[in-house]
Amino acid sequence: MYPWSSTGTSPFSHPDNEGAESGDMSMGEEQQQPHQRRQKFNNLRACQSCRASKVRCDQPNPGMPCLRCQKSGKPCVDAASQPGKRQRQPINSILEMESRIETILSSAELQDSAGDGETAHSTALRSPSQLSHHIQPFQHLPMGFAIPFNGGNSGTEDLNSSIRSWLNDNITDLDARTTETIFSHYLTNMVPTFPVVVFATGTTAADVRRNNPILFLAILDVASSGFCALETQRKLRKLIVQAYVHCMLRTEQYTLGLLQALIVSATWYRTIEPVEPGEQMDIYQISHTAANMALIMRLGESLNAKSWGGPMFPRREMKKGPGSAFQADSLEARRVWLGCHYICSNTSMSLRAPNIMRWTRLMDECLEVLENSPAALLSDRLLCQHIRLQHITEEFAMHLSAEEASAPAKSRAIQIQVTHRAFKRQLSEWRRTVGDGWDAHCTATSDDVPEDNAQRLTPPPPIVAIEPHAITEFMDTIDNIFRVFTSLDMSTIRALPAMYLIRIIYTFIILVKLYFAAAKLPAQDAVLQVDGLQVSRRFNRVIQMTAGWGPLWPATKLTTVFTKMRSWFESGGDNNCQRLQQAAAWLTGWELKPPSQGRDAHAMNMAEVVSDDGSIVASSSRGPASWVPSLASTDVDTLAFSHEPPLGTEFSIAPPPFRSMSCATKSCSPQAGAAEFMHDEEVPLEGQRLGDLPNIDQMDDVGMDWSQYTNMGFDLYNLDAPFLPNPPSGFDPDAAMKDNCADRNT
């Protein structure tokens, strides 16, 4: 029997309360009932005030306040009524979150009851943050031309179906025959200039429209000029811009088809004049967006998983090598990866900013697979030549930038020349790898540009001195560029990538600057040099080429620009002195060194000349400086390619990005001059059938503002014109070159 059973009390009774009231309980009595004392302290709980102060709660009478609360006058909360501490377990919050997710998923499935089982399954795998983003209704895009995206699901299928339905409802004049014609024009005339987004033999416009509508929309946007009404082209442009905004900002559904569409829009970008709200498209933003999407998609990691490890792993190379069937399913992704690198590299060099897609071993593996895989297309080898040439250009620019930052001033010029010659050898090796069947004229040189705006604004403008032997190289290169460009018909020019047109315009700016440099010579020498340039004849020839094509892109733009340039050139009549006085400073910043000074120049062709204010302009100075190009070893070579329609590619080593050789300023920066020239509204337009042409207030010849890239480094020998077809039998390029030189000397 328990001890408390003899007294008839329960274990929860307090027999010592009466002794506690009298206060005369002795120690012996407490020791006689140890179990009741322990029970008392185990069952009684302190009030809230005593628990907060962590002191003993002395409550003589049950139901009455404790002694401490009575003395302080505080309310004594009954200890028995105080709830116990709730033990929160982590599993409870997780279960609560899962129940909420299940509720959201069930509501989403009810809203999207029309969707198939596969779509519902993919929706169930989304994270809560993504799900809360997707189930919200889309806001209207600020384009003034809304795409009818369905419901709340922003998946790829929903976007594709929305684009397809929009095309069917709003572009009624684009029937199946017209779209097939535009698609055939893209495949036949535009793809050969840069075959990065290609299709298998037998692919039709209906197939692309059904499987990849956003890519089909991008192709219609860049290739529809001349095949449909202008209003239809504007609808296509607004839709593709709105689709890009939606994919970039309002969804995370990134696919290879979206990357292909961005590459197409960036490569063959064009403007529709006049630009209306909702039609603005930034070519630089598109290029970097494509590269960022490729990185976010981890496209490079997916391709790295197919790596064969190089020659150190022969067994793995036999199984997963570039010529194995294992690589056949990755060809399209490799083209997209190389295409993103290409357009991003061109953009970064134009903006003089770092390229976010640096060259890695993966790029080399992509080139090997595209060149050796049995499943590769014929155009893939041509694409690889484009990529390799751009890589040589970018590496050359990076090496010059590193030498500018690290080399001492005295040895900088020598190191630059050594680097220049080394990369010219790489360019020669690239030439030898090109296939047979095409002619390409390749030249290379270096150039120097200012580093920052403060240097460009430093007066007075420097003098760029040109060695006597270099003027021959200048003229030979311009002759070849002019011959290549004028040999093309306008249908071929219209299919060229946008950047080629900018560089052709820059070549003619160089021609005008050489004219004013030759006009500074003594009378007899000036006549010989000016006659050899044939500036008026060349301008008349290109204007005649482009003026007859009316408003088609890029005929109107090229005609307007070349006419303005001719107006600058002919503004002073036949008097050279008057022309020099009326011409802008950026056109007259060059001078030709007399032969006597040319003999004293050192071997690296870097010279010091005196500017107009008498200050010495040195190649190694950080202030105003002169640049004497080294072109002694630059030759114009003729080599062959083998593919069918005309092809355009890059053949020159451009100036380095994000660097300054501190050897030029605004006066010798063609881009700065071009911007000034294109903003001059006082120069009248000349030429026949040009009265209805719109005035251009900015250098927007390919839909890009020249102010965005005033430092764009296009060198004088940048022959970015398409390849020529096979020459007629018996054609001797060396003899033709000699005849051209003989005509100039006579």
Swiss-Prot record:
Keyword Zinc in record = yes
Q: Does the keyword Membrane apply?
A: no
Indicate the principal place this protein occupies in or around the cell: nucleus
Sample GO molecular function, one term? DNA-binding transcription factor activity, RNA polymerase II-specific
- Output the Gene Ontology cellular-component terms: nucleus
| InterPro entries, sorted | prtT (IPR051089), Zn2-C6_fun-type_DNA-bd_sf (IPR036864), Zn2Cys6_DnaBD (IPR001138)
Q: Which PANTHER family match?
A: FINGER DOMAIN PROTEIN, PUTATIVE-RELATED, TRANSCRIPTION FACTOR PBCR-RELATED
Name of the protein described by the UniProt record: Transcription factor pbcR
- Source organism of this protein record: Emericella nidulans (strain FGSC A4 / ATCC 38163 / CBS 112.46 / NRRL 194 / M139) (Aspergillus nidulans)
Gene name as annotated: pbcR
